[in-house]
Regions:
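PLP-dependent amino-acid enzyme catalytic core
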Residues: 1-139
Length: 139
């Protein structure tokens, strides 16, 4: 229901960015976007140190990251066959971010909002900041 609620609160939204991880939130976001607002683009942020989703998209089958090294440990789960299928059909792109970019996003949220968030939650923001040209309408 989160996609439905976002669309109701912001009817003009045209892009959503979520963390990658095991693909549950990402695939659910994709399906919700496809159902409630066809044409709504969904992107995923993924740590470079746990890039199994990017590898899986490239190979067309569920892959494990060749190495795992990230502060965003909430995203260490692997895609399933079903989530990969949904992501292949509906995700606009998976955007890789470095550890430094994740830490910079964490710092930005703390400095601006005075809240501490989990590193995995900072990954989508890091992806947006790194790819500002892709999201220029958002700034």
């Amino acid at each position: 229901t989160c996609v439905k609620e976002i669309i109701e609160a912001m009817p003009d939204v045209d892009i959503l960015v979520t963390p990658g991880g095991g693909g549950g939130l990402l695939s659910g976001t994709c399906l919700g976007a496809h159902y409630f607002k066809p044409g709504l683009k969904v992107y995923a942020g993924e740590p470079e140190g746990a890039a199994d989703a990017v590898l899986s998209i490239q190979s067309g089958k569920v892959e494990k990251a060749p190495f795992v090294n990230t502060i965003a440990d909430g995203l260490l789960t692997t895609l399933s066959e079903r989530t990969l299928e949904i992501i292949q059909a509906h995700v606009s792109d998976i955007l890789l971010v470095s550890e430094d970019e994740i830490k910079a996003a964490l710092r930005l949220v703390y400095e601006r909002m005075k809240i501490i968030i989990e590193p995995s939650c900072a990954v989508p923001l890091a992806a947006v900041l790194k790819n500002a040209d892709l999201f220029k309408r958002c700034f």
